[in-house]
UniProtKB/Swiss-Prot annotation:
Keyword Magnesium: yes
Domain KARI N-terminal Rossmann, residue spans: 15-208
Any one of the GO BP annotations: isoleucine biosynthetic process
Biological source species: Escherichia coli O6:H1 (strain CFT073 / ATCC 700928 / UPEC)
Family per record: Belongs to the ketol-acid reductoisomerase family.
Catalytic activity: (2R)-2,3-dihydroxy-3-methylbutanoate + NADP(+) = (2S)-2-acetolactate + NADPH + H(+); (2R,3R)-2,3-dihydroxy-3-methylpentanoate + NADP(+) = (S)-2-ethyl-2-hydroxy-3-oxobutanoate + NADPH + H(+)
Residues the record lists as binding Mg(2+) 1: D217, E221
Protein name stated in the entry: Ketol-acid reductoisomerase (NADP(+))
Length: 491
């Protein structure tokens, strides 16, 4: 099979990359009614599978889970989760033939096997759903022409999808219809009903394309969301210890620092995050971020280029075929780093201390978010999509590091994200070492002293921060999320 994106001509590629429309709330006036009375069968009962299913059932839909025979016979975790939550569970052969909508929520690397197994069992005119378009776009999976193919992609981990729904809210969501598979013209109605059933319409829905979702999702997770946090954690920890900081304190400053500073990012964008600093520290963080952007721009561009061309996907799929040799090696090496093995600090670090002593970390966040956003937009991805795949998801990933360091982040994210994270961080760490060697006192681990600042310089820096395109689109999109739960700041 050929990479679907690479079979398109340039005009088609640009059209699909640039497909992005913020949908009005009135477009979801019918809620999930289009799927009411129809049978929805979910394949896979991981975090997205279970939590989307719970939301959809609570929205009045008929939900069941199709699992492999061995998973049922051996009562594996997927079977236990589905049955303990009161869902009907059966084999593919028992449930798929009656399904009006089959939702494939298995890991990316299983998609081809799953889809090739369920396709022959699906009835004529049924629909197939995804929450990530990798199988369609990068693998180039061919789906029967009578089958409608749709996507509903919540921009949060599965647990967050459920928690926000229980609060009567939801999480921002991308929806799409595969243009090669919409024989009855009902794909958008199915996708809208599915999104409404998960609660996504309450937080904002973007009508996108499979191509735009995949290319932007891969870019975000490889660079700012995971790769930058991993590279930054390793570099900052080593720098602190090298300068005599207690390893336990250094570890805590970094582990919980990302979460604390990105909570400000979530509530008020880069502007609020930078406003948490004193004026001298803000000027220094801005200067550091500009240096970082200049150094890292070629690396961000390379990742985007490799994602657009399919080079990244072909390399990762080759590793799948080689039993994940590279992935597992990188995972093991990460687990042995000094940051991951450092002792725990029993003392308390105050919230403002994370900002005052983490000027470099704030600069890394600013540089990474802006670079990821700019690189995506330069490649034809619309600003709203680029925002969700860079700034919006960052606090959620930072929260995983706060739980159990990089180990937890790499466990929670997909194998696809983890593989891309290692590619980026293994290139970024040596790239930034000369920069790290030139840091000044107060950049990391010590507060920058209060002092006089030049009013004109401060005015210009504030204007530069607030006028960046990601701040403009972010302000608009956050307006739809005013009811979002505040991620608890770790202490």
């Amino acid at each position: 099979m050929a990479n679907y994106f690479n079979t398109l001509n340039l005009r088609q590629q640009l059209a699909q990359l640039g497909k992005c429309r913020f949908m009005g709330r009135d477009e979801f006036a019918d809620g999930a009614s289009y799927l009411q009375g129809k049978k929805v069968v979910i394949v896979g009962c991981g975090a997205q599978g279970l939590n989307q299913g719970l939301n959809m059932r609570d929205s009045g839909l008929d939900i069941s889970y199709a699992l492999r025979k061995e998973a049922i016979a051996e009562k594996r975790a997927s079977w236990r989760k589905a049955t303990e939550n009161g869902f009907k569970v059966g084999t593919y052969e028992e449930l798929i033939p009656q399904a009006d909508l089959v939702v494939n929520l298995t890991p990316d690397k299983q998609h081809s096997d799953v889809v090739r197994t369920v396709q022959p069992l699906m009835k004529d005119g049924a629909a197939l759903g995804y929450s990530h378009g990798f199988n369609i776009v990068e693998v180039g999976e061919q789906i029967r022409k009578d089958i409608t193919v749709v996507m509903v992609a919540p921009k949060c981990p599965g647990t967050e999808v459920r928690e926000e729904y229980k609060r009567g809210f939801g999480v921002p969501t991308l929806i799409a219809v595969h243009p090669e598979n919409d024989p009855k013209g009902e794909g958008m109605a199915i996708a809208k009903a599915w999104a409404a059933a998960t609660g996504g319409h309450r937080a904002g829905v973007l009508e996108s394309s499979f191509v735009a979702e995949v290319k932007s999702d891969l870019m975000g997770e490889q660079t700012i969301l995971c790769g930058m946090l991993q590279a930054g954690s390793l570099l900052c920890f080593d720098k602190l210890v090298e300068e005599g900081t207690d390893p336990a304190y250094a570890e805590k400053l970094i582990q919980f620092g990302w979460e604390t500073i990105t909570e400000a990012l979530k509530q008020g964008g880069i502007t609020l995050m930078m406003d948490r600093l004193s004026n001298p520290a803000k000027l220094r963080a801005y200067a550091l971020s500009e240096q970082l952007k200049e150094i890292m721009a070629p690396l961000f561009q390379k990742h985007m280029d490799d994602i657009i061309s399919g080079e990244f996907s072909s390399g990762m799929m080759a590793d799948w075929a080689n039993d994940d040799k590279k992935l597992l090696t990188w995972r093991e090496e990460t687990g042995k780093t000094a940051f991951e093995t450092a002792p725990q600090y029993e003392g308390k670090i105050g919230e403002q201390e994370y900002f005052d002593k983490g000027v470099l970390m704030i600069a890394m966040v600013k540089a990474g978010v802006e670079l990821a956003f700019e690189t995506m937009v330069d490649s034809g991805i619309i600003e709203e999509s680029a925002y969700y795949e860079s700034l919006h998801e960052l606090p959620l990933i930072a929260n995983t590091i706060a739980r159990k360091r990089l180990y937890e982040m790499n466990v929670v994210i997909s194998d696809t994200a983890e593989y891309g994270n290692y590619l980026f961080s293994y290139a970024c760490v040596p790239l930034l070492k000369p920069f790290m060697a030139e840091l000044q006192p107060g950049d990391l681990g010590k507060a920058i002293p209060e002092g006089a600042v030049d009013n004109a310089q401060l005015r210009d820096v504030n204007e530069a921060i607030r006028s960046h395109a990601i701040e403009q689109v972010g302000k608009k999109l956050r307006g739809y999320m005013t009811d979002m739960k505040r991620i608890a700041v770790a202490g």
